[in-house]
């Protein structure tokens, strides 16, 4: 078993859409970001990559690489999930905390869990998404942006498929 923690933050700016957990959320602003700015997925990717000791999302999808400009973060998550599987792990569970004063997250949490569980190739019961505020304190309290924490538990697959490098060395 391995545990990983991820964190990300993005500032509001420009026009939407505002995407969180793979779900478009009605709001007057979007995020300032190289990709679609989905901070929930970015934190989740970092948590998985951290548990696998594979650095972080910036190393795998640098914002200096034009191919990732405006890319859906769901594509990035699916790639990270393939790395997890290649390394012989599967998701035990994920717990994601969105810190935002606005917009209200409660109406969208189940949709986020559904979307993320699809990309993680797991059940909705293994993915929790919750939201909180900072009681109007700090940058999230001033509605300047959103931050997200994610924690994952990865479980070793009993009989993982061999990695391509291992097959080539046979």
Curated annotation (Swiss-Prot):
What the entry lists under Pfam families is as follows: YgbB
Cofactor comment: Binds 1 divalent metal cation per subunit.
BP term (GO), one: terpenoid biosynthetic process
Q: What class of enzyme is it?
A: lyase
> Which cofactor(s) are needed, names only?
a divalent metal cation
Q: Which residues bind 4-CDP-2-C-methyl-D-erythritol 2-phosphate?
A: 8-10, 34-35, 56-58, 61-65, 100-106, 132-135, 142
Q: What is its EC number?
A: 4.6.1.12
Q: In which pathway does it act?
A: Isoprenoid biosynthesis; isopentenyl diphosphate biosynthesis via DXP pathway; isopentenyl diphosphate from 1-deoxy-D-xylulose 5-phosphate: step 4/6
Binding positions for a divalent metal cation per the UniProt entry: 8, 10, 42
Keywords for this protein:
Isoprene biosynthesis, Lyase, Metal-binding
Gene3D superfamilies tied to this protein: 2-C-methyl-D-erythritol 2,4-cyclodiphosphate synthase
Highest taxon, organism lineage? Bacteria
Ranges annotated as spanning the membrane: none
Please give the catalytic activity noted in the UniProt record. 4-CDP-2-C-methyl-D-erythritol 2-phosphate = 2-C-methyl-D-erythritol 2,4-cyclic diphosphate + CMP
GO MF assignments: 2-C-methyl-D-erythritol 2,4-cyclodiphosphate synthase activity; metal ion binding
Q: Where is this site: Transition state stabilizer?
A: 34, 133
Record text on subunit structure and interactions: Homotrimer.
Family per similarity comment: Belongs to the IspF family.
The free-text function statement in the UniProt record for this protein reads: Involved in the biosynthesis of isopentenyl diphosphate (IPP) and dimethylallyl diphosphate (DMAPP), two major building blocks of isoprenoid compounds. Catalyzes the conversion of 4-diphosphocytidyl-2-C-methyl-D-erythritol 2-phosphate (CDP-ME2P) to 2-C-methyl-D-erythritol 2,4-cyclodiphosphate (ME-CPP) with a corresponding release of cytidine 5-monophosphate (CMP).
Q: This protein is called what?
A: 2-C-methyl-D-erythritol 2,4-cyclodiphosphate synthase
Native organism: Colwellia psychrerythraea (strain 34H / ATCC BAA-681)
């Amino acid at each position: 078993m391995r545990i990983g923690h991820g964190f990300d933050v993005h500032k509001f700016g420009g026009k939407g859409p505002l995407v969180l957990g793979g779900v478009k959320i009605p709001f007057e602003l979007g995020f300032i970001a190289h990709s679609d700015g989905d901070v929930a997925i970015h934190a989740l990717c970092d948590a998985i990559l951290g548990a696998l000791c594979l650095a972080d999302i910036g190393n795998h999808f640098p914002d200096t690489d034009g191919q990732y400009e405006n890319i859906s973060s769901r594509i990035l998550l699916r790639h990270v999930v393939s790395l997890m599987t290649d390394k012989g792990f599967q998701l035990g569970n994920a717990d994601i905390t969105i810190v935002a004063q606005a917009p209200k997250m409660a109406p969208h949490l189940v949709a986020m869990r559904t979307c993320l569980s699809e990309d993680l190739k797991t059940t909705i019961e293994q993915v929790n998404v919750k939201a909180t505020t900072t009681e109007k304190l700090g940058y999230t309290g001033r509605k300047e942006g959103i931050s997200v924490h994610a924690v994952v538990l990865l479980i070793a697959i009993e009989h993982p498929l061999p990695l391509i490098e291992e097959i080539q060395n046979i």
